[in-house]
UniProtKB/Swiss-Prot annotation:
One of its GO terms (cellular component) is cytosol. Residues 30-204 form the EngB-type G domain. InterPro entries: G_ENGB_dom (IPR030393), GTP-bd (IPR006073), GTP-bd_ribosome_bio_YsxC (IPR019987), P-loop_NTPase (IPR027417). GTP binds at residues 38-45, 64-68, 82-85, 149-152, 182-185. The gene is engB. This is Probable GTP-binding protein EngB.
C-alpha cells in the first residue's frame, strides 16, 4: 500500500459537476472516470462522501437524486460517477425499468469508464443485482472492485469470514480479476485500500513510485 496516495488530494477537491437523466446528458466522454454502483441502502453515498472527505452525495434513504447519474470532477481529466441506486422498494416498477435502461446504456457505451466500484452490504452480499453487475464486468473485461460496506456492523471475526466467503465465491464464479475488501464509512475502515484502487484506475498509481495494492 502506498504511503502517500496521489489520489487523496484529488478526492479532497472533488466537486459536483452535473446530474444526467440520460447518457446524452453526460459530460464529454474523454479522460478517465470511475463509477460507483450498488443497491439502494448499500452505503454508496456514505462511501463516496468518506472517500472524498466531502458531503458530495446525498445519504437520505429516499430515492431523490439517485435516479440520476451524478458526476463529480476531480480534475480536468478525471471524474467519479454516482450511478442510480437499484432496488428501492417504494419506487414504481416503470421507474425502476427506466433507471435500469439508462444504467445499462451508460455502462455499455462509456469509453472513459476505467473501472467500477461495486458496493455490497456485508450482511446481504451477492444479491441478484450484484451478480448482474459481476456478469457484465466479467463479460466486458471491465475492472471491478467490491466494497463490503457496513463492516462495522459485524464483529471482527465475522467480518473477516464474510470477506473470505465473498472473495472465494467471486473468484470461483467470475475469475481472479476482481478484488474485494472490507469497508466502513463511520470507522473509515478500508479508505486507504480503496484510494489505492482509484489511483491505479485513474492513472495515478505510478506518481508516488509504487504500484497500488488492489486488495485482491
Amino acid at each position: 500500500m502506498s504511503f502517500k496516495n496521489p489520489v487523496l488530494g484529488l478526492c479532497q477537491q472533488a466537486a459536483f459537476m452535473l446530474s444526467a437523466a440520460r447518457v446524452d446528458q453526460c459530460p464529454a466522454d474523454d479522460g478517465l472516470e470511475v463509477a460507483f454502483a450498488g443497491r439502494s441502502n448499500a452505503g454508496k453515498s456514505s462511501a463516496l462522501n468518506t472517500l472524498t472527505h466531502a458531503n458530495l452525495a446525498r445519504t437520505s434513504k429516499t430515492p431523490g437524486r439517485t435516479q440520476l447519474l451524478n458526476f463529480f470532477r476531480l480534475d480536468d481529466r478525471r471524474r467519479l460517477v454516482d450511478l442510480p441506486g437499484y432496488g428501492y422498494a417504494k419506487v414504481p416498477i416503470p421507474l425502476k425499468q427506466h433507471w435500469q435502461h439508462h444504467l445499462e446504456a451508460y455502462l455499455g457505451s462509456r469509453r472513459s469508464l476505467a473501472g467500477v466500484v461495486l458496493l455490497m452490504d456485508i450482511r446481504h452480499p451477492l444479491t441478484d443485482f450484484d451478480r448482474m453487475m459481476l456478469d457484465w464486468a466479467g463479460a466486458s473485461g471491465m475492472p471491478m472492485h467490491i466494497l463490503l460496506t457496513k463492516a462495522d456492523k459485524l464483529a471482527f471475526g465475522a467480518a473477516k469470514n464474510a470477506l473470505l466467503k465473498v472473495r472465494r465465491e467471486i473468484h470461483k464464479g467470475w475469475g481472479e480479476g476482481m478484488s474485494v475488501q472490507l469497508f466502513s464509512a463511520p470507522k473509515r475502515q478500508g479508505v486507504e485500500e480503496a484510494h489505492d484502487v482509484l489511483a491505479r484506475w485513474l492513472g495515478l498509481a505510478g506518481d508516488d513510485g509504487g504500484e497500488a495494492d488492489a486488495g485482491a
